[in-house]
Design a protein with these regions (language model features):
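Conserved catalytic-core segment of NTP-binding enzymes
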Residues: 1-2, 8-109, 116-118, 122-124
């Protein structure tokens, strides 16, 4: 059985740095999929990241730094919570290009797509 739960409390922002007490992942979980909103790329950390100060600290930059696909991937890799990545809100050629650049930074399987449009593609 599979249950997907989006309950990370990111205040509707596409990117997030997790506090030390989260995410709460049950011991029984055999698969953890990190979900990243591609719409966070191209905006400053301050405007697109929940816990922007922590996100900037993890990245070693300031909150006015513009998020690149590589930077977003670096934070997900640094936190190390998931063994799969789903890049969501990929709805244009530019989004796909950014998603591919992000996927290149991961060693785990990556899927990109749009839950809203019901489409996805395996990037690796």
């Amino acid at each position: 059985d599979f249950v997907l739960v989006e309950a990370d409390g990111a205040k509707r922002l596409p990117l997030k740095a997790h506090a030390s007490h989260e995410p709460v992942i049950p011991e029984e979980a055999q698969r953890v999929i990190m979900v990243i909103g591609i719409d966070g790329v191209g905006k400053t950390i301050r405007e697109t990241c929940h816990r922007s100060a922590l996100y900037a600290q993890l990245a070693g930059v300031d909150e006015e730094t513009v998020v690149t696909p590589q930077l977003a991937a670096r934070i997900v890799n640094a936190e190390g919570y998931g063994d799969r990545v789903y890049i969501n809100k990929v709805e244009s050629a530019a989004d796909y290009e950014a998603a591919q650049a992000m996927a290149n930074e991961f060693s785990c399987p990556v899927i990109a797509g749009s839950l809203h449009q019901g489409v996805y593609v395996c990037l690796h």
